[in-house]
Amino acid sequence: MSAADPSQGNKSWTVADSAALYGLDRWGEPYFTANANGHVQVKPRGDQGSCLDLVELVEELKSRNLNLPLLIRFDDILEDRLEKLHSAFEQAISKYGYAGRYQGVFPVKCNQQRHVVEQLVESGRHWHFGLEAGSKAELLIALSLVNDPEALLICNGYKDQRYIETAILARRLGRQPVVVIEQPDEVERIIRSSQELGAAPFIGVRAKLTTRSTGHWSSSVGEKAKFGLSFPDLLSTVEALRQADLLSDLRLLHFHIGSQINDIAVLKDAIQEAGQIYVELTKLGAPMGYLDVGGGLGVDYDGSRSASAASTNYSLQNYANDVVATVRECCKPHGITLPILVSESGRAIASHFSILVFDVLGTGTVPGAVPNQTGEEPLTIHNLRETLAGVMATQKGAASEISRLQEAWNDAVKFKDDALAAFRLGYISLTERALAEQLTWACAEAIMGQLPCHETIPDDLQGLRAVLAGTYYANLSIFRSAPDTWAIEQLFPLMPIHRLKEEPTQLGHFADLTCDSDGKLDRFIGNGQTKTLLELHNLRQNEAYMIGMFLAGAYQEVMGNLHNLFGSTNAVHIRMTTGGGYQIDHVVRGNTNSEVLEAMEHNPEILLERLRLASELAIQRGELKINDVRRLMDHLETSLRQTTYLQG
């Protein structure tokens, strides 16, 4: 289905038109723009540094045998996000005269990749930036990487005795772990461990807030929240710590109201409630000192700056201002020392730095040209030809013709159904059945071509856009590289990274490589609303058509799975150099077929040996020649060494 004239795009189409169409000038700020060549360009330091042509970068990486799909991580963007976060809080602290400071942590669960976590720890060292762990494995990562005695190690999640003892003993290594009590039964384990080891960790408590949240993560708050202490539990925890002479170690209050807070009003209410809890804990005798506002600092995926699920109605500076101002308002009247502010803003830090680039393998469209009549045809075929002729005879773009076009489409659907019924009963041939289908789609295309552009169109005719849309077959696995698009209908910006000087004349959606009907991308960012089709270009012979998925640096890699045994993609870490160049800091090769087979307990050597023996038997039976066997085994051995994606 054409978005414009399918044979000829708009001659006056500009790069700016493409940027507006895909929302690049909204969600891409300040890291992604389009250049005069019609390519997406990356500004890893935002408006402060030089640019990289993304298409040229991809081609150079491909020449290094780093084939698509390819995950490109810009470490400069990661650093810039960290700087912007701290700068926003520094400005807010200065603006409101807050007698305290901000000290953030990165939740390791957001992106556990070694190079990512190492980069954040090193870049955040002068802010004493720390890490948050939610499991024993993540705690091990945090303890091994953070050697700054002033940086926080927030210990969240379920905790057994060994987890707690590890955190306590880590204080003697010069680390500063804070064991956050999230379940009532953890109090006794902390007390017992402290008594046995003769030492205690810094202790925190997570409160279940009653503030109503919104969006997918609204269940993170309230009485039925998975983690946190109710108000009675908070009081009993304080009393238990007092009895064990550990109340002096209660230093932190933590809450979490969701991974993506869309509405700033929700945040204000939550901080106000948490601020009062903090005040009351100090009145009960806890020294406190830290208020951890958790995650939730959102990402404006669709660029609409709204409270929709894919956006936020606030800026980073708005967020910092409200955190600082609200906590100050809660504590000041009570003469309480203002706490050090902590956030776990993983999504806001990591989302922007990663771009997934994949190629399109081909397209599936509705049947094309209709064969001319060569002889007598069944009545259903005759009726469809007459319907098509009638549509072609209508006045193009005339509002008065809408009802006639709607009637024609209803007729076409009826005649197609008649043809299907006739085929089932054996009255028409497969060739005639196929012709009926071709004629139906020809009617649909003709009707869409005749519709006026600026009139209200009936719903059934509007639906022809989806009926005629093409399927673009993507060289990736949604379940591996973008699982949230399937699991929670997360929206990520998607667009071609080249050909932006050309008007996209097709509408389509993407289907991935998996043998699963859910393996598709069919929800896209529109102008303030979600759309089911994306404007795309016709494919060209012997020319790659490359698509970029943006803002997907948080959660996607670790949550991806091996559906159909499609593994991780190739990944590179890019850093800008002086003079506008770049260097590749790290190359992380994607899973090979051999590796994913081994992950499922298959031994590649045994598999090859079985096939070799089967080939030898086939030679003996005269079913295969030696040259054929050599080619077969060569293909198999090469495939085991290659990544799991298609390579032409």
Swiss-Prot record:
Kindly indicate whether the keyword Metal-binding belongs to this entry. Answer: yes
Q: Which GO terms describe its biological process?
A: arginine catabolic process; spermidine biosynthetic process
* GO MF annotations in UniProt: arginine decarboxylase activity; metal ion binding
Q: In which pathway does it act?
A: Amine and polyamine biosynthesis; agmatine biosynthesis; agmatine from L-arginine: step 1/1
Quote the EC number.
Answer: 4.1.1.19
Task: Provide the residue positions that the database annotates as binding substrate.
Answer: L291, D292, V293, G294, G295, G296, L297, G298, V299, D300, Y301
Keyword terms of this UniProt record: Decarboxylase, Lyase, Magnesium, Metal-binding, Polyamine biosynthesis, Pyridoxal phosphate, Spermidine biosynthesis
Instruction: Please give the residue positions where the record annotates the modification N6-(pyridoxal phosphate)lysine.
Output: K109
| Family statement | Belongs to the Orn/Lys/Arg decarboxylase class-II family. SpeA subfamily.
Q: Which HAMAP family match?
A: SpeA
Please state what the protein is called: Biosynthetic arginine decarboxylase
Give the source species: Prochlorococcus marinus (strain MIT 9303)
